[in-house]
């Protein structure tokens, strides 16, 4: 019986000529006359056992492909040109892609020009980008490859600070390509992260390119009242859809977003004060009642920082309280802070670096009702007085922007709205031009390079130029409005000394 001899890494395989002749594959057609010669056909780049598996497939139309042998069989099938086996191997690899092997499969697909595997592995990287940064192969991605990944509209990052941490980890392995940092959009980053990058000696150029990462764009949550039942809706920039999350029957509550959950704090139900806090996951729409606060109260002030929800002051029946406490997301124990110097409700609270600032509101007892202008700062585990606001205000809204505080006041006893800037380093207040007037309740949040105000219409205030934009928007019956990103960078004063600790904390929070 005539045979064709193959040599693979010094090992010999003799194959019946009839198998070669009957094969429909081009590789075997080209060597059908080679058996007339005495020398063996040398096959390079093919595993001996993989070639045996291909011969079994050619003879019996059966092949044993596992996750352990799929790559070597696929390489052999590509070189020998056996398309059915190539397809089987590619399907096996795609079925077994995960965050720990997707970069290796991505590189494999490029090496052998396998488009389906390339697309599948790229999709896995895009969906699990924060996890794949732990892969030793991550640092070997080229600059162009990482740029393509991070520029994809569906790349799974929820904040531009996360993108920054991904880039910093890659730059650590590729110090000659620091200019990749220019794919960042600084207006979507926190001041803290921008300062950290500056301390590293990196400069982000002003980008005129459109924002492609949908995940870094602001989510929106709205609570709208109708017949004493308020409906909660959520807008996702990744899906571009509004979805109804649920309902609440509370009044005089406060709300805040932390780790993609909406917390509804205190308030009243059927004219009765409550001390419960409800939490709804904005993705799963699942509700949970978290541990009660220390007392029954409404009209509290809230702020969030570093994974913690802070609740300050409030109204306990008819008396203002100075209680300050916080709850870490995912835990069940409220931690008490020292009480405010002046109890109050309806004030504003905001973080600047590691410090809490509380301002305005109302101090009330059974005998007194005092509208406040004083400002307190919680720093180094104690409250201290700061320069008071220029006027007394019972309704105050405050946001941090570029290390300072911007305050917009509502009206009750006041005759008009005011806009102030508090310069933190100078402990100084200045009054700025106010675009609108005679608005009581509103919602204020910082959105990159502008401050968004939802009042009788939608306003954008640009602090750097002290200019305003006005947009038509129906604001009727809105009880709460907030724009947010899904991850919260720790707010702290980053210095050269604290920079390593800050970056380490961010890496643990964002990339693990």
Swiss-Prot record:
It holds the Pfam family BTB. Residues 2-67 form the BTB domain. PROSITE patterns: BTB. The keyword Repeat applies. The keyword Zinc-finger does not apply. It comes from the Viruses. Keywords: Early protein, Kelch repeat, Repeat. Kelch repeats lie at residues 216-261, 262-307, 309-354, 356-403, 405-449, 452-498. Gene3D superfamilies: 1.25.40.420, Kelch-type beta propeller, Potassium Channel Kv1.1, Chain A. Belongs to the poxviruses Kelch family. This is Kelch repeat protein C2. It comes from Vaccinia virus (strain Tian Tan). The lineage of its organism: Viruses, Varidnaviria, Bamfordvirae, Nucleocytoviricota, Pokkesviricetes.
């Amino acid at each position: 019986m005539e045979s064709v001899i193959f040599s693979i890494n010094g090992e010999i395989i003799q194959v019946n000529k009839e198998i070669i002749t009957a094969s429909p594959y081009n590789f075997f057609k080209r060597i059908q006359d080679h058996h007339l010669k005495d020398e063996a056909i040398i096959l390079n780049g093919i595993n001996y056992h993989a070639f045996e598996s291909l011969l079994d497939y050619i003879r019996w139309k059966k092949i044993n492909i596992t996750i352990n042998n799929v790559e070597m069989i696929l390489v052999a099938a590509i070189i020998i040109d056996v398309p059915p086996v190539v397809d089987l191997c590619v399907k096996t690899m795609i079925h077994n892609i995960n965050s720990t092997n997707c970069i290796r499969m991505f590189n494999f697909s490029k090496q052998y020009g396998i488009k389906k595997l390339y697309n599948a592995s790229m999709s896995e990287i895009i969906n699990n980008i924060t996890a794949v940064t732990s892969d030793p192969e991550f640092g070997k991605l080229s600059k162009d490859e990482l740029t393509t990944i991070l520029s994809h509209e569906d790349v799974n990052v929820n904040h531009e600070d996360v993108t920054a941490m991904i880039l910093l980890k890659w730059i650590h392995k590729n110090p000659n390509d620091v200019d990749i940092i220019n794919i960042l959009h600084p207006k979507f980053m926190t001041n803290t992260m921008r300062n950290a990058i500056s301390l590293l000696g990196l400069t982000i150029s002003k980008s005129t390119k459109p924002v492609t990462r949908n995940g870094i764009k602001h989510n929106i949550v709205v609570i709208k009242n109708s017949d004493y039942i308020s409906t909660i809706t959520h807008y996702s920039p990744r899906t571009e859809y509004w979805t109804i999350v649920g309902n609440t029957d509370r009044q005089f509550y406060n709300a805040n977003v932390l780790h993609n959950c909406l917390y509804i704090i205190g308030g009243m139900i059927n004219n009765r004060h409550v001390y419960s806090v409800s939490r709804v996951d904005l993705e799963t729409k699942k509700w949970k009642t978290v541990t009660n606060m220390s007392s029954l109260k409404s009209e509290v002030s809230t702020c969030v920082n570093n994974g913690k929800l802070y609740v300050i002051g409030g109204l306990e029946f008819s008396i203002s309280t100075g209680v300050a406490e916080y709850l870490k997301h995912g835990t069940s124990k409220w931690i008490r802070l020292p009480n405010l110097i002046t109890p109050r409700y309806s004030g504003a609270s905001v973080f600047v670096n590691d410090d809490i600032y509380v301002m305005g509101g109302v101090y009330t007892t059974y005998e007194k009702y005092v509208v406040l202008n004083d400002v307190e700062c919680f720093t180094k585990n104690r409250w201290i007085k700061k320069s008071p606001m220029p006027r007394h205000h019972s309704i105050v809204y405050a946001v941090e922007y570029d290390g300072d505080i911007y305050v917009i006041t509502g009206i009750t006893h006041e005759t008009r709205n005011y806009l102030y800037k508090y310069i933190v380093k100078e402990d100084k207040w200045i009054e700025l031009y106010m675009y609108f007037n005679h608005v009581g309740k509103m919602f204020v949040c910082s959105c990159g390079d502008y401050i968004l105000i939802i009042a009788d219409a939608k306003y954008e205030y640009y602090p750097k130029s002290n200019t305003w934009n006005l947009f038509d928007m129906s604001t009727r019956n809105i009880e709460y409005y907030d724009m947010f990103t899904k991850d919260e960078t720790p707010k702290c004063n980053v210095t050269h000394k604290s920079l390593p600790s800050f970056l380490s904390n961010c890496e643990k929070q964002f990339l693990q």
